[in-house]
Structure formats: structure tokens, C-alpha cells
A protein has these predicted regions:
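Short glycine-enriched loop/turn motifs at secondary-structure junctions
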Residues: 1-2, 62-67, 97-98
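Core segments of cupin and vicinal oxygen chelate
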Residues: 7-49
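Helix N-cap motif at beta-to-alpha junctions
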Residues: 12-13, 74-78
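Short, charged/polar surface micro-motifs in flexible loops or helix N-caps
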Residues: 46-50, 60-61, 77-78
Length: 120
């Protein structure tokens, strides 16, 4: 058994799709647009099984997202931080609780906490 995907119910599908593809750098593995029902995209890094599914329901739908953090490992946390600043995403400062660990947080369009971490 392995972790397959995390679903994020989004209020603004296009804004979330842009965040996860242009900022995070994920690829769209599957896209579905069912008029009067929903839009859905399955996103992952090239060649990876674990995915993030973003869904927007056309009918009223509420979801509570407090307490959720999604973490991405990256090879250059400073570059990701600069990209977040350049895109106006207002990231936290880079934190380094020990010399081999560096991370920061940014919120996605639905205010889900996204962490980017680099371990040397």
C-alpha cells in the first residue's frame, strides 16, 4: 500500500491550477470538466505516483481546511522562496532550525498551508 493522492476542494479552480502548475511546478496528469457538475485536475511531478487532486464543484459545497499542511521537498529552498516573493504569494521567512534543514510556508489560493523544505 502507498499514499496515492490528496484532494483539495477549491473555490477558484483556475487560480488553484495556476498555483500548483506555475508556482509548485506540478504537471497535469488528468483534467476533467463536466459542465454543471465539476472541474478536476490530477497533478504530480513527472514520473511520480503520488498526486494532488484539485476539484471545484459547481453546486454549493463547503469544506473546512484548517489544520492541513502539504509539504514539498525541494533542492533549492531559496529559489522557491524567491519565486514565491516574485509571484506576490507573501511567503514566510525561511526557517533553519538546524544547519541541514531549511523551510518556508506559503498559502495556496484556498488558504491551505504549503511547506517547501530542503534537507542537506
Amino acid at each position: 500500500m502507498h499514499f496515492y493522492h490528496l484532494t483539495i476542494i477549491t473555490k477558484d479552480f483556475d487560480k488553484s491550477l495556476k498555483f500548483y502548475t506555475e508556482f509548485v511546478g506540478l504537471n497535469v496528469n488528468r483534467y476533467e470538466d463536466v459542465p454543471d457538475k465539476h472541474k478536476l485536475a490530477m497533478l504530480a511531478e513527472h514520473g511520480e505516483d503520488t498526486q494532488i487532486e484539485i476539484v471545484h464543484y459547481n453546486a454549493p459545497f463547503t469544506a473546512e481546511t484548517k489544520g492541513i499542511t502539504v509539504c514539498f521537498a525541494c533542492s533549492d529552498v531559496e529559489s522557491m522562496h524567491k519565486k514565491a516573493v516574485d509571484m506576490g504569494l507573501n511567503p514566510s521567512e525561511i526557517r533553519s532550525p538546524d544547519p541541514k534543514l531549511h523551510y518556508f510556508y506559503v498559502y495556496d489560493p484556498d488558504h491551505i498551508s504549503i511547506e517547501f523544505k530542503q534537507e542537506d
